[in-house]
Amino acid sequence: RILFEKRIERLPLIDENRRIHGLVTRKDIRFLRERPFASKDRKGRLLVAAAIGARGDFLERASELLRAGVDCLVIDIAHGHSSVMAHAVEQVRGRFGAVPIIGGNVSTTDGARFLKDLGVDAIKVGVGPGRGCRTRLETAAGVPQLQAIREAWWAVEESVPIIADGGVSHDKDVFLALICGASAVMLGSALSGTDEAPGLVIEDPMP
């Protein structure tokens, strides 16, 4: 209120000893009003996770991402219930300590339990349900997404968050994933056409 009434851009927050503890700007207030449910850290910055894979230079990628300020690392491969995943999680934990790790992808009870036992902080569930994933086409193996979410929940219940990855074509898919046990839902194609999404903009040639 003070910012808008006095038409000032910044308002420092001080204690009784006149020590500055923070700074509020009109941009901060506008952001809070427009995006009240955004996930932010203690400094008010958006939380960011980045994928590093599980082979090759994944440790170097993790190091550079953490240096850039990433909050969480995503170790994801097509088949997360594997020795490759176990090795990657062990290496990341050994090198970077308690950094939050999301592991995936799995689609079975055993796979979810495997990732839980590895000590990941969240489990990514889904093998092939999304438009961009070719695992089912190339291997002829996969589990329907809602069944995969439910099996993962049976394995870990409330102990580890489950992230439903893929298969969201309509708003009802988000609802179904959440009631089946997912704590969060990843969106790919649903957001790929937005202005904020990276990639080339291809305009319709037809008038």
Predicted regions and their residues:
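The conserved cystathionine-beta-synthase
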Residues: 1-7, 14-15, 31-33, 57-64
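Cytosolic beta-strand hydrophobic patch enriched in CBS
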Residues: 3, 9-24, 49, 73-76, ...
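Active-site-adjacent beta->alpha loops and helix N-cap segments on the catalytic face
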Residues: 19-21, 25-39, 57-61, 77-101, ...
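Alpha/beta catalytic cores of nucleotide-metabolism and tRNA/nucleoside-modifying enzymes
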Residues: 51, 118-121, 140-164, 168-207
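Catalytic cores of alpha/beta
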Residues: 60-68, 101, 106-125, 168-183
